[in-house]
A protein has these predicted regions:
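A short alpha-helical cap/connector motif
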Residues: 1-127, 134-155, 159-196
């Protein structure tokens, strides 16, 4: 999977990595920054998604589409698609450009809007990556977990870097008898929940 990533995808990943690094240094306002995952987290997510059961693959928080590309690599390998949600119009526009430039539009379905308004229509969720504003994590968790297939995965970003802000949701997940959960120290910390 990693050895067969198309050059246009790798080029776009590098381009987005450069923008993200610049955003972190030049004082770009927080909501305008890409705030994307590091590449090792992307690889980790792709491996998890590639081993999830057959079902829906969704992402909550697209930004410019960097993490989506990693998930799309896994989905393309398996002949699946991913649906990703982005609430900010300017980031959705950049994500559309990402998927067009990389020719991943056939694998990725971008929905512009609040994921919480759309998640009810998804059953049979095999994999969900949650990387949105921290105040929506707990609500998204409670919507997604009942929709996960047995063996399905919910992965939430920033479980270590934003541990205090996410504490109620993290505590809930780690004690939730519907899932096996742990925090993995990859990137900014990934909460990984597997539906029992």
């Amino acid at each position: 999977m990693f050895h067969s990533i198309h050059n246009v995808v790798l080029e776009r990943m590098r381009y987005l990595e450069e923008i993200d690094a610049k955003d972190r240094e030049d004082g770009t306002p927080r909501l305008q920054r890409l705030r994307q995952i590091p590449s090792d987290t992307g690889r980790f997510l792709a491996l998890l998604a590639a081993n999830a059961p057959l079902g829906e693959c969704i992402e909550i928080g697209t930004s410019a589409g960097y993490s989506t590309l990693w998930l799309a690599v896994a989905c393309e390998e398996l002949g699946r698609t991913i649906t990703t949600f982005e609430v900010l119009p300017e980031k959705a526009k950049l994500a559309r450009e990402t998927f067009q430039v990389t020719q991943m539009g056939k694998v990725v379905r971008l929905i512009e809007g609040d994921a919480r308004l759309h998640l009810a229509q998804y059953d049979n969720v095999a994999f969900c990556f949650l990387d949105a504003e921290k105040e929506v994590y707990e609500e998204c968790y409670e919507i997604v977990i009942p929709k996960l297939l047995k063996g399905g995965l919910l992965v939430a970003d920033n479980a270590i870097s934003h541990q205090e802000a996410l504490k109620p949701m993290l505590d809930r997940a780690l004690e939730d008898k519907r899932v096996d959960a742990l925090i993995v120290p990859v990137g900014k910390g990934e909460l990984v929940c597997r539906k029992i």
